[in-house]
Design a protein with these regions (language model features):
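Short, surface-exposed beta-strand/loop "edge" segments at domain boundaries and coil↔beta transitions
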Residues: 11-15, 57-60, 179-181, 207-214, ...
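Structured domain cores in non-transmembrane regions
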Residues: 28-102, 224-296
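Elongated scaffolding segments in large macromolecular assemblies
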Residues: 103, 116, 290-304, 310-311
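Extended, well-ordered protein cores
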Residues: 124-210, 214, 321, 325-373
Length: 400
């Protein structure tokens, strides 16, 4: 999305750090450490001076040059802008110039409402302009009262009906848009659901009821990013945190097994890290495994996820015959011959498999376990490791 050179405004002799935004997840901690070397990049302060900025898709962001920003604000803005299509980026660029915005907070606020303006960059194509304008009004909830959509006539009504403001990106028509504060300067708003996100939560200090003081977190992520989110939310330790579930890519069986009133944020993150490479079939299989094993916490589910290859799953098989049919036709363990389909005894094979295995039918199909440990032993987490993780999550005296 963009690259920015960030420097310490008070100590420019320390040099600048060039950061790619949004910051790749595997380089986030490295980036924070690099900023710390020039004594910027703290969690709560706007201590990064934007010395330079380059963006092909969003040149209006250069208006932030020489302004102060927080590194996580810049990262949030980049993620938000990545979700915009080509015309939406044009709207954002033009609106930023139209309203004279230059601070990162103003840009963050604009990202929520820039879709409400209409931008005409080509007056030779009024048909397309009219269609765009009509769709824009649908976004604002104020569509024109008209019959069948006629693009050119709609564009002509727009041009004649309200003043346009010339920018380098085109002529901007406000459509009554008002810039409203969505960011309070501390608590980052909810952002676009990232492609790699498996679970989204809100975290707040114990007893806090003002939802504006909660932080949104998307898992999996780095531990340092979680710790910074805790600081923004005023959470000093894991024991003083409340978790609110927003959504996940996991199956209902997994979500229902988690008691978010008592879960550890870091254990949930470890679970999501363990499932980061899962495909849809893996999530479905894990749901079936959870129905069979009945885990009661994120740590147990993580153990199941990490040992998913010790389970066999026949999706949608709910009878011995369906199980036998799946194994012979779809499991790839046998060379199935379509010409002999009437000669296979699926029911007998399914019954035989049931008698030989430690398996059961669940809502999603048939699931069996072939590991050497009992399920209780498999799900048992290392108590010493859990204790160490909780100690590492203490926030007192943290530098960031």
């Amino acid at each position: 999305m963009f690259k920015a050179s960030l420097e310490n405004n008070n100590l420019p002799e320390l040099g600048a750090v060039t950061v790619e935004f949004p910051i790749p997840e595997d380089r986030y901690e490295e980036t924070i450490r690099a900023l710390e070397k020039i004594k910027i990049g703290t969690t709560l302060d706007k201590d990064c001076c934007v010395a330079d900025l380059r963006s092909t898709d969003c040149p209006a962001l250069r208006r932030m040059i020489n302004r102060m920003a927080n590194v996580d604000e810049l990262d949030w803005l980049a993620k938000q802008l990545e979700s915009l299509d080509r015309y939406e980026l044009l709207q954002f660029n033009a609106a930023a110039e139209r309203f004279g915005l230059s601070s990162v907070g103003e840009m963050m606020d604009l990202s929520f409402c820039s879709r409400e303006v209409t931008v005409i960059s080509d007056f030779n194509d009024l048909e397309n302009v009219g269609r765009r304008h009509h769709l824009t009004l649908l976004v604002t909830g104020t569509p024109e009262e008209q019959g069948p959509l006629v693009g050119t006539e709609t564009a002509q009504r727009l041009i004649a009906g309200q003043p346009g403001h010339v920018t380098q990106y085109g002529v901007v028509y406000d459509n009554g848009m008002k810039l409203k504060q969505a960011y309070d300067g501390k608590h980052l708003p909810q952002s676009w659901w990232a492609e790699n996100c498996l679970m989204e939560l809100e975290i707040g200090a114990q007893g806090e009821t003002d939802k504006k003081k909660f932080e949104w977190v998307q898992l999996p992520t780095s531990q340092i990013k979680l710790e910074r989110a805790m600081l923004r939310a005023g959470i000093s330790s894991c024991g003083e945190m409340q978790l609110l579930f927003s959504g996940s890519r996991f199956s209902d069986e997994v979500d229902c097994a988690l008691d978010f009133e008592y879960e550890s944020l870091f254990e949930l993150n470890h679970l999501c890290q363990a499932c980061a490479e899962f495909q849809d079939a893996d999530f479905e299989k894990l749901g079936a495994v959870c129905q069979m094993a009945k885990p009661v916490c994120a740590a147990s589910i993580r153990q199941l996820a990490e040992n998913l290859d010790q389970f066999d799953f026949a999706p949608d098989a709910h009878t011995p015959e369906e199980l036998g049919k799946y194994m012979i036709q779809r499991s790839r363990r046998y060379e199935y011959d379509e010409k002999l389909k009437d000669f296979y005894n699926y029911d007998d094979y399914g019954v035989k498999k049931l008698l030989q295995e430690d398996g059961t039918f669940v809502d999603r199909g048939y699931i069996s376990y072939r590991g050497t440990l009992t399920l209780e032993e498999l799900m048992r987490d290392d108590p010493a490791e859990s204790c160490q993780q909780e100690q590492e999550a203490k926030m007192e005296g943290m530098a960031w």
